[in-house]
């Protein structure tokens, strides 16, 4: 298809899983859940910020993507249910994310898969960086997560890497020719 997938909100980057070449997208959610999703040709990512669906009423400018506002101290789980990143109620066949940020966005950036024996148990796992927005007690920057994505691409476990350095953002993660990140 000319359009590989649709229904995305804010993709930050696409990377390909070594060995399978399965594409994965890292995507920012609207004041809540960030996601990593395996892409499927013709797949719908399930983002639909229209008013008057899924229990929502009218929204400013007919766009519900920022409602309810995170600054309003709305519980992240309540906010996520109101405007889900992947709306499986409206789109039951939407591509399911392998990993989400548990309803509290921290500004996910693009990721890459780590390759090479120097990565030991992390070889073949995806690493993602965060901007860190510092709301509701979240840290500002200085965070990398390593995701062990299941072979079917439908689930993942996370290891958060703490770095001994001042807060920093990681908008682009790339392995160099020698395998260093």
Language-model features: where?
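Beta-propeller domain segments
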Residues: 1-160, 168, 178
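Blade-level signature of beta-propeller repeat domains, shared across WD40, Kelch, NHL, RCC1
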Residues: 174-181
